[in-house]
């Protein structure tokens, strides 16, 4: 009988603990959140994203975001080369296309700890997001064809829909909440290959594959501002 009472008390405590933690936890008081996130990654690119998330369970949120990724520096080895096309003998990549720019959507799940610490009106916890970046499956570049004579050139757009369009990622972070506002800082790890579409662009027996190094892992740091309601 004693063992049964002990087990019953243990089960009751296990059931009540999440309820009491939820009731006293600062971060579970509001169900909806709007986020603005900025990221710098190891592919010389910045990302800007707007997202919405909803609390599904006390410490589990689901969200969806949309944004843009753009390089501020390109590390391509070549931006021109030889070609045999009509009377033209060489090609040159448009300067506007030196740096990759992509649009993306980002569905994700966020798992958070209960509130770990607070000081005055500042409340702190840890969270981790996991999801997939869904890239717009299209990329184009402008190519100018030259023959060595001034004012004799031709400009064409070449495009592809082949490339890495689904990119898994994780984002561990430290989060601080003050009333309705939140601030997060953390790291991002993904399988982003930023040049995957570029390497699939071909024109007149010329492949851009050799211009870009293959890198299957990307890391970055991000800052997030949020409003909860």
Question: How would you label these PLM feature ranges?
Answer:
Residues 38-42, 66-72, 111-113, 130-138, ...:
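Transmembrane beta-strands of outer-membrane beta-barrel pores
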Residues 30-32, 42-48, 58, 99-105, ...:
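Residues that define the transmembrane beta-barrel architecture of outer-membrane proteins
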Residues 21-65, 69-70, 75-76, 220, ...:
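Short glycine/proline- and aromatic-enriched beta-strand/turn motifs that initiate or cap beta-hairpins
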Residues 35-38, 90-98, 154-161, 206-213:
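Extracellular loop and loop/strand-boundary signature of outer-membrane beta-barrel proteins
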Residues 168-229:
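Predominantly the C-terminal beta-signal and adjacent terminal strand-loop region
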Residues 54-150, 166-167:
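Gram-negative (and chloroplast) outer-membrane scaffold detector with strong preference
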């Amino acid at each position: 009988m004693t063992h049964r009472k002990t087990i019953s008390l243990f089960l009751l405590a296990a059931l009540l603990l999440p309820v009491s933690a939820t009731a006293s936890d600062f971060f579970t008081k509001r169900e909806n959140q709007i986020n603005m996130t900025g990221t710098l990654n190891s592919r010389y690119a910045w990302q800007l994203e707007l997202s919405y998330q909803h609390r599904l369970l006390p410490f589990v949120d689901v969200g969806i975001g949309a944004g843009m990724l753009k390089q501020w520096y390109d590390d391509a080895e070549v931006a021109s080369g030889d070609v045999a096309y009509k009377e033209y003998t060489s090609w040159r990549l448009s300067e506007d296309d030196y740096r990759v720019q992509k649009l993306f959507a980002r569905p994700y799940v966020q798992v958070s700890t209960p509130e770990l610490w607070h000081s005055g009106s500042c409340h702190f916890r840890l969270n981790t997001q996991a999801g997939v970046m869904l890239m717009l499956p299209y990329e184009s570049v402008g190519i100018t064809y030259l023959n060595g004579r001034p004012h004799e050139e031709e400009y064409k757009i070449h495009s592809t829909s082949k490339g890495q369009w689904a990119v898994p990622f994780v984002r561990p972070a430290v989060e601080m909440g003050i009333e309705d506002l939140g601030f997060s800082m953390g790291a991002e790890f993904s399988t982003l290959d930023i040049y995957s579409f570029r390497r699939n662009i071909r024109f007149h027996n010329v492949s851009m594959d050799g211009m870009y190094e293959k890198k299957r892992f990307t890391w970055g740091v991000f800052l997030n501002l949020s409003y909860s309601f």
